[in-house]
Amino acid sequence: MTHLRRSTSPEWWPVERKGAPWSIKPSPGPHPANSSIPLAVLLRDVFHYAKTLREARLIIGKGYVKVDGKVRRDYKYPVGLMDVIELTPINEYYRIIPDPVNFLRPIRIDKSEAGVKVCRIEDKTMVKAGKIQLNLHDGRNIIVDQDEGRKYETLGSVVVNLEDGKLMDYYPMQPNQYVIAFNGVNVGRHGTLINWVRSFRKRDAIATVKAKDSEFRTVLNYLLVIGKESPVVKVTE
């Protein structure tokens, strides 16, 4: 099916439910459909830089919108967690962050920060020539030497240079790291990871995070490491 009923689209999408019966179904891409938003919806219903889908498609088709430094002409392209959006005609830059109200939302960032992205390591696999492939949350795959690859652990985060794809830094998932929740009832809350209760699967462990206002608990799999003592990228206005 190429269309999606508005009534069944994710609740956090800012689309009018009582309007036209159909919405935009995200194209297959780096983020799951239930945790991403089509580029045209972002442009029309979030940024309000287009009044209609036709206008949004025209803007996108002309190559005026970049995602993670690359021009995207597919109006259905799925935009998700930590993606960097660039609106080239007006030199505006945004990062998609977790939000307690809207699940995901863009925040304005400086051009100096638009060239980096924090990505979580979802898996590690051995590939040819003794190399290790890091599989990141946004579908990105990065090949590293075996010796270097040993230091990277799943659920840890890497800082990626969007211009050349190289790794700039690494933050393991461990106590005293700065994390942000991107799913669950605490989505959008962030703070210092205190510890977690051991479980058979590390991803299922219950973690305790010390936020600015209070502590909260969530599944370890719902956390993204975004720095050591503080975030390395902007996550608040």
UniProtKB/Swiss-Prot annotation:
Entry keyword set: Ribonucleoprotein, Ribosomal protein, RNA-binding, rRNA-binding
Q: What residues form the membrane-spanning segments?
A: none
Q: Which domain of life is it from?
A: Archaea
Q: Fetch the InterPro entries from UniProt.
A: Rib_uL2_dom2, Ribosomal_eS4, Ribosomal_eS4_central_region, Ribosomal_eS4_central_sf, Ribosomal_eS4_KOW, Ribosomal_eS4_N, S4_RNA-bd, S4_RNA-bd_sf
Q: Which GO terms describe its cellular component?
A: cytosolic small ribosomal subunit
Keyword rRNA-binding on entry: yes
Statement: the UniProt record of this protein carries the keyword Iron-sulfur:
no
Q: Which GO terms describe its biological process?
A: translation
A Pfam family that the UniProt record links to this protein: Ribosomal_S4e
* Stretches assigned to the S4 RNA-binding domain: 37-100
Which GO molecular function annotations are given, in alphabetical order?
rRNA binding; structural constituent of ribosome
Q: Write out the similarity annotation.
A: Belongs to the eukaryotic ribosomal protein eS4 family.
Q: Which HAMAP family match?
A: Ribosomal_eS4
Q: Any idea what this protein is called?
A: Small ribosomal subunit protein eS4
Gene coding for it: rps4e
